[in-house]
């Protein structure tokens, strides 16, 4: 593959909007870390067993699936617990990325997109050839997060603060996609970024 795009940004900045556009309009293969992270904690998985052992049955719903809201309350208010959880999940996500990239390489796809919200924090920048950061203001992040997840101001703030500041991610980007304006503006930036020579 000539291009492996690492698509990242802060929570609520618009990564899904960009990845959906790249998949549906540009027909690019999109591999999503969040999808793999959900698979990692499916009922019966070693990771879910470790989570239940550490935090008790309260993090499981009656059908033995993960109670995401309860786990979120624990890890987003305690950086040490969040790090522990990430240490359980990130190796699985990395292995899935590597396996999928191998399969796509065999199919000779020229460009692949990896959606990795914690690209920098999880140390996965070595998997990509360029980094696209979807950016918007912290105020916009807060508003989107509160509306989408129905979180309180304090809960939204805690989730945003759990990630590397968006300004730092922006400074490390190959390409910055500014999502503080209209969808049309964002789409134009994505189209232009795809035409930009590989980094």
PLM features per residue range, with description:
Residues 126, 147, 151-196:
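Small-molecule kinase domains that catalyze NTP-dependent phosphoryl transfer to phosphate-bearing small molecules
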Residues 98-106, 111-147:
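ATP-dependent NMP and nucleoside kinases share a basic, alpha-helical "lid"
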Residues 16:
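Walker A/P-loop
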Residues 38-110:
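ATP-dependent small-molecule kinase phosphotransfer cores
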Residues 7:
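Hydrophobic anchor at the beta1->P-loop junction of P-loop NTPases
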Residues 28-41:
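Short beta-strand-centered segment that lines the nucleotide-binding/catalytic pocket of NTP-utilizing
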Residues 13:
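ATP-binding Walker
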């Amino acid at each position: 593959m000539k291009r492996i795009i690492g698509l990242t940004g802060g929570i609520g900045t618009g990564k899904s909007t960009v990845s959906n556009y790249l998949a549906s309009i540009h027909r690019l293969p999109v591999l999503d870390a969040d999808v793999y992270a959900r698979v990692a904690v499916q009922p019966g998985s070693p990771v879910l067993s470790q989570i239940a052992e550490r935090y008790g049955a309260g993090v499981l719903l009656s059908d033995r699936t993960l109670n995401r809201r309860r786990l979120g309350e624990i890890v987003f208010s305690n950086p040490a617990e969040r790090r522990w959880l990430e240490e359980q999940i990130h190796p699985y996500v990395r292995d899935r990325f590597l396996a999928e990239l191998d399969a796509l390489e065999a199919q000779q796809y020229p460009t692949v997109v990896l959606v990795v919200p914690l690209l920098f924090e999880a140390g996965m920048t070595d998997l990509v050839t360029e980094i696209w950061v979807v950016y918007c203001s912290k105020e916009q992040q807060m508003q989107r997060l509160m509306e989408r997840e129905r979180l309180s101001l304090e809960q939204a703030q805690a989730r945003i603060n759990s990630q590397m500041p968006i300004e730092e991610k922006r400074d490390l980007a190959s390409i910055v996609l500014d999502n503080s304006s209209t969808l049309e503006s964002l789409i134009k930036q994505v189209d232009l970024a795809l035409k930009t020579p590989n980094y």
